[in-house]
A protein has these predicted regions:
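C-terminal luminal/periplasmic domains and tails of membrane-associated envelope-modifying transferases
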Residues: 15-31, 35-36, 40-43, 52, ...
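Transmembrane alpha-helical segments
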Residues: 1-11, 48-51, 55
Length: 260
């Protein structure tokens, strides 16, 4: 009806249009605004936008479809100058609070036409990007190879088997390690991991895991079953290190890690 149309237009005016005008009047001319509902904000702000959903930024749809952890990993690969300087988003859509900094403004409007009740404008914060790229436990030495789970490019390079992976299970995980906040993309709900990674004889294989109950994991390297891996329950991640046998070849190997 005409009344519904008028109410919807007014809701957009009070939320998205209002924040777009706020951005025009407040943010620097060279600001890049990360958005997840792009129309009115892009039009009224007059600022360059970065559409995290990908409707108007063509590089982004596959990362949005994959899940929050893959978007976080993708942002780690991007040049700093290409990342948004600010976000005007529905926070529950964004699902990566680790990169949302100080809130500058918000508009709360209750209307079904909108993507959410509250849309917020915030400074972007990238302190946690690349904060967990290396092993963070006691294991040190030359890095031979690395599979970065949820990083779509790394998964493809290592033949990572997705199995039953879902978007909802693709998350950003946090931990406080070595006196700073760390974050890493990952996939939850896994009971079987299968991938290929470069090895060397007597090298140490390090796996970063989150385990809800203590268990023993089975490990295979190129079809050879090695000693079981015991892990404890920890709501944050833990790193398990396993010394590989001397007979392991200096080549890519197929790894399988399985929970009971």
């Amino acid at each position: 009806s005409i009344d519904d149309l008028a109410q919807s237009a007014d809701a957009i005016r009070r939320q998205q249009t209002s924040l777009g005008r706020w951005a025009r009047d407040t943010l620097p001319a060279d600001a890049i605004i990360g958005v997840n509902d792009t129309g009115a904000i892009a039009f009224f702000s007059g600022r360059r936008t970065f559409d995290v959903v990908g409707l108007t930024t063509k590089s982004e749809p596959r990362y949005w479809a994959a899940g929050a952890g893959s978007r976080f990993e993708h942002y780690e690969r991007m040049p700093q100058g290409a990342l948004p300087t600010h976000f005007i988003v529905y926070p529950e859509w964004m699902a990566v609070p680790q990169i949302i900094g100080e809130e500058l403004a918000s508009r709360t409007v209750n209307a079904t036409i909108l993507g959410g009740k509250t849309m917020t404008a915030s400074v972007a914060s990238y302190d946690v990007l690349r904060s967990a790229e290396e092993p963070l436990g006691e294991t040190r030495g030359e890095l031979i190879d690395r599979l970065d789970v949820a990083d779509l490019e790394s998964e493809a390079d290592h033949g990572y088997a997705l199995f039953w992976a879902t978007q909802a299970q693709n998350r950003v995980h946090e931990a406080w390690l070595a006196d700073r906040r760390r974050a890493d993309g990952g996939r939850a709900g896994r009971t079987l991991e299968r991938f290929t990674i470069k090895l060397r004889p007597s090298a140490t294989l390090v796996a970063r895991l989150i385990v809800e109950t203590p268990m023993t994991l089975d490990l295979w390297v190129d079809g050879q079953k090695l000693a079981p891996v015991s892990v404890s329950a920890d709501p944050e991640w833990q790193e398990v290190a396993l010394r590989l046998p001397a007979e392991v070849g200096d080549k890519p190997a197929k790894i399988e890690l399985a929970a009971p």
